[in-house]
C-alpha cells in the first residue's frame, strides 16, 4: 500500500512517472526483468544507493489512521526515485542474512564434523540392550564348584546328624524297655521268694499246732484210769 504524496498528478500512480501527454522513452529491461524509464528508476535492489539509509515511515497529510504508508529516503539525489514496497528488505542486511544463513550447516553440506562425530559415536550409535532383556551367559566362576561342593557336604552332614539322632532315640527306647523288663522280672522273683517264705511259715505253724494237740491228748489219757480206780 502506498500513500499519494501531495503535488503529484492524478494520473501518476508511482513516483517518477511522467505527466500524461508526454512521449515515453524506450523502455529497457533491467537485471530483474523490470521495464523502467531510466537507469535510476530501475529496481536494482537499491544497488548504488548512497549511504544505504534506512527508509522512514511517513503518514499521509490527512493524519488519519490508514494503512497507506510511504517510505522516504532522506538525502536521495532525486525525488523521482521509486521507493520499495512495504515489507521489502534492505539490501545491506540481505548479504548479512545470507551470510548468517550460510554459516548454518545444511544437511547436504559436510564440513567434517558429521563424519568425525559418526566415527567417534559409532559405538554409541549401535543399539544397546534394554534393561529388561537378559544378557548372554558370562564366563563360569571358578568359585561356584567349590561352593556347590561345600553346600553338598553340609547337607550330607545334616542328614547324618539327623540319622544319628534317630538311631540314638531308638536305642534309648530299647534300653528303657529292657530295663523295665528286668525290673519286672526282679519283682516277680521277689514275689516268688516271699510266697515261698509265707508257705514255709504257714507249714511251721501247722506243725506246731499238731504237736501241741498231741501233747495235750497224752496228758489227758493217764489221768482217766486213776479216776476210775
From Swiss-Prot:
Regions of compositional bias (Low complexity) in chain numbering: 84-93, 115-126
Cystine bridges: none
Origin superkingdom: Eukaryota
Bias kind Polar residues: ranges: 62-71
Pfam family, any one: DUF4653
Residue numbers spanned by region Disordered: 1-144
Family, similarity comment: Belongs to the UPF0500 family.
Protein name according to UniProt: UPF0500 protein C1orf216
Organism: Homo sapiens
